[in-house]
Amino acid sequence: MGDWGFLEKLLDQVQEHSTVVGKIWLTVLFIFRILILGLAGESVWGDEQSDFECNTAQPGCTNVCYDQAFPISHIRYWVLQFLFVSTPTLVYLGHVIYLSRREERLRQKEGELRALPAKDPQVERALAAVERQMAKISVAEDGRLRIRGALMGTYVASVLCKSVLEAGFLYGQWRLYGWTMEPVFVCQRAPCPYLVDCFVSRPTEKTIFIIFMLVVGLISLVLNLLELVHLLCRCLSRGMRARQGQDAPPTQGTSSDPYTDQVFFYLPVGQGPSSPPCPTYNGLSSSEQNWANLTTEERLASSRPPLFLDPPPQNGQKPPSRPSSSASKKQYV
């Protein structure tokens, strides 16, 4: 096997900008795929062609039967699977690096604009444009990029591509080899003169390895699907929170009708502490309220001394009498 160190370093950088499910997927890829294949792959499949024997001495028959039995070696097929499945993740890493470099350039440009002594309209407009561009790049407090906006689209697309590629390679493995390694392969292909029986070395061990890689592939596929569900739920929750923030009701005291559910009281007025308080306005009709106002005015008039004394009557004239209470009451009714 070749050196996987470079690919591991690249995928390790992706782990810093992935979700929890994405980190688990990378762990499965590192430990149960690349590491196991690198350690045990050569020892299990190293004798794949050398120990493939057929019961014929016809020159070239063994080679053509091996080609028919294994169109591509299992171990090379799995290496191609790892490379293709990792490619969408590397594309996402490229987008992360691009946004990180862009955010650094925007911060540098913002610092240069703020350092200018004179603030003319052009500088203000340029600074506002830089701030708008920086607002599109969401950076956490620890310096990691948040998966939002365009980065979210790239991440979802990468997970979708990984799922499709994973399912495609699993289907291809089933079509090419099946899920078991048969100990005897029957071949009929030119230049073989007749049906030839070919024998595979250590078929049981290879069957166990095939099943192990199949289970790991299914786990990776399930993790990709779970990550899609996780991303969908995250997007829906953010949308619901944003909608609730827009549709939030106004705070108490800011109602459009300032007199809603308010009761107005009249202060009690009387000659002594035992005087009954005046009833509320909301509890009386208009006629009853007028009568109550009239009674209050009469009490006030009787308790205050007159401000001006009337002149004595002359020539036998009678002093003008007060208007009758009935006439006064009529004007309030």
UniProtKB/Swiss-Prot annotation:
GO terms for cellular component: connexin complex; gap junction; plasma membrane. Residues 41-76, 166-207 are extracellular. It is a multi-pass membrane protein. Residues 292-333 are annotated as: Disordered. A connexon is composed of a hexamer of connexins. This is Gap junction alpha-4 protein. The chain crosses the membrane at residues 21-40, 77-99, 149-165, 208-230. Residues 323-333 have a biased composition (Low complexity). Belongs to the connexin family. Alpha-type (group II) subfamily. It comes from Homo sapiens. Keywords: Cell junction, Cell membrane, Gap junction, Membrane, Transmembrane, Transmembrane helix. InterPro entries: Connexin, Connexin37, Connexin_CCC, Connexin_CS, Connexin_N, Connexin_N_sf. It is found in: Cell membrane; Cell junction, Gap junction. It comes from the Eukaryota. GO terms for molecular function: gap junction channel activity. One gap junction consists of a cluster of closely packed pairs of transmembrane channels, the connexons, through which materials of low MW diffuse from one cell to a neighboring cell. Gene3D superfamilies: Gap junction channel protein cysteine-rich domain. GO terms for biological process: blood vessel development; cell-cell junction assembly; cell-cell signaling.
